[in-house]
């Protein structure tokens, strides 16, 4: 057996399958594209669903990849076991209706045992198969030559994740030797059991059935192969280390952490857990942030926040009590640079995001301690010495408090924690996660006639907008037909088309097919599984027939508007990088005739002056009349030129490059203006946040920009007319009006204060003695809480000693103020507690200091009842 680095294993795997005729699929972003069912890419096959369910036919049915993945369903086990991770790499080979079991098994065996490749001792390998999969069993037994005792039939060896492809699987195990287990009485000591001796190194899934919506299984029209080999696990064997964490994928991170902590890995098993958690979580967070995810309170952002906080908490166990995770980002970049150079390129931005989040969490820990103090005080008041499990879980889930930390503080206060309640809440969360996983992994059921259409369809719409086309296929209601008549809707494929199919954010062209037999309007164009342009049509006259010729005519006005907006998005993308930083990446776009929408990653808001600079830069490039050059290059050569490859796009070996002078260079399959001057004008309409770390700009160009600015000017002129001034003098006029308004407000406040003082004089006559305490509870006229507070302050001074509650109703809402003079505060009267009780009786809540507190209520009809309660409350204190 060879001793290989992780980079060598990855490279060797891909090279082996390339030699077997496989195309290497680049590792996709961890953030799924066009798959809302997934929070993260969580397996090698997750990015290939579109091939397996037939939505897209790949150029090569044999595919291999090294896919970065994230799974967080077992996060609590990470660091405590040898092989649980949140971030990992899956090496996989896949067949989309090409080879099947025989080749998959033979190639797996060759890769693992051949001296040219991994070179495992065949005697150390065992396999599991499904009891009913005789075909796989016979291949292993009769063709590979494995003895029967090393082929274990296990019932669970059937891969099924809901509707879609499913089938039996076979797993290959490596025997690490007796040092990892030799108890003959251990019921789990076998390949496939729960033990450390027999490690699963490869899972081969044979997708041969459709799991139908009604629960039945039917044979797939095309059988598939889906395999997965965990890189970390394979490296632990090849590098002869006890766990994945001692491999070259983790040890440099652990060594760097030792330098920060002043502690050593391998000396204390409990402290080793902290080192492992930190090493695992920084890998996950580094890659996720690099792919565009940012910490937040929901979705992916919440996962990142939770991982960082878990690592920071564990860091305390090895003496690290400051932000430090960000210092490990360059280490991750160095380890992974062979296959993921982008991590090193983005290291500064990733580190900045992580540092900000760490600093925020250190502040949050203090908040959590304050919440814990309140929880303990509440429990003690109720006569309990046990912190409820739900509260312990809330501290854990919301504030990142581990159960052990809560227990530690509880013990200091002579209290304990309800473990059973905590576990119940934890199990509910696990159930939610399991339910989510059941939903997210299912693929669409394989089938449909579109995948069977192999006829070539050529797109010529970059250069021609009117061409003569022959209809080669008509699909109506999912079935092929020979013709469709007036009023009917269908999808057609033609031999030559000028219509652009929606992709890369650019919407589809519209237009018509016109011929002697009929006319059809093109409503939409999408790509069929085999890449042809699929036109959605409505027949307006006569009939559209297969084999007939038609004039295909694109709506030139809409296309001219689309190309202006598309080239403008390229200019905008570069301007965003120039102004905001190189970390900005496209996260989605819409290029329509009437507007463009551009989503991008950015950590923070875009300031108004930054927006102005961005808009000015784009217009500057437009007015320079820069030629737009389009050419084709090999992918690696285009990237070497500095061409931007966009979010979620898959590229072939030869790519289309759009170059705008020396300013912008992008890989793009869309339609563009020949010269930036054709855009005319660019105007940003809005900028907003649409999610954690993602911003959106909407803009218009050309005539739409002119109309937008004309409308804005008209509004300005109308406002100026109403204020009897000119647009140029509008600011000065508004400044004058605001000055007048402020003066009127001051006069109004002064008058209101005098009225309040007069009302306070009147209210002093309504004071009642309750148990020797002067009490005033009254409904008054007040415009806002400030007026109420001023009135209460005035009454406190006038009365000297009193408990006061005032209520005012504005717009159906109740405002309450409670005030207690200092002498009565010392006797136990508390304005905050009083106002809370009063507010609860009119549908509200509030609180505050012992001497002054405010609240609100929703039910104005119950104000009288609420005020009546004041006397009752005072009696309860007396």
Curated annotation (Swiss-Prot):
Keyword Zinc: yes
Database matches in Pfam families: DHHA1 (PF02272), tRNA-synt_2c (PF01411), tRNA_SAD (PF07973)
Annotated TM spans: none
Cofactor(s) needed by this chain: Zn(2+)
InterPro entries listed in its UniProt record: aa-tRNA-synth_II/BPL/LPL, Ala-tRNA-lgiase_IIc, Ala-tRNA-ligase_IIc_anticod-bd, Ala-tRNA-synth_IIc_core, Ala-tRNA-synth_IIc_N, Ala-tRNA_ligase, Ala_tRNA_ligase_euk/bac, DHHA1_dom
Location in the cell: Cytoplasm
Disulfide bonds: none
GO biological process, one term: alanyl-tRNA aminoacylation
Enzyme class: ligase
Molecular function per GO: alanine-tRNA ligase activity; aminoacyl-tRNA deacylase activity; ATP binding; catalytic activity, acting on a protein; transferase activity; tRNA binding; zinc ion binding
Zinc listed as a keyword: yes
Gene3D superfamilies, per the entry: 2.40.30.130, 3.10.310.40, 3.30.54.20, 6.10.250.550, Bira Bifunctional Protein, Domain 2 (3.30.930.10), Threonyl-trna Synthetase, Chain A, domain 2 (3.30.980.10)
Residues holding Zn(2+): 566, 570, 668, 672
Cofactor info, note text: Binds 1 zinc ion per subunit.
Written domain comment of the UniProt record: Consists of three domains; the N-terminal catalytic domain, the editing domain and the C-terminal C-Ala domain. The editing domain removes incorrectly charged amino acids, while the C-Ala domain, along with tRNA(Ala), serves as a bridge to cooperatively bring together the editing and aminoacylation centers thus stimulating deacylation of misacylated tRNAs.
The protein's name: Alanine--tRNA ligase
Organism for this UniProt entry: Geobacillus thermodenitrificans (strain NG80-2)
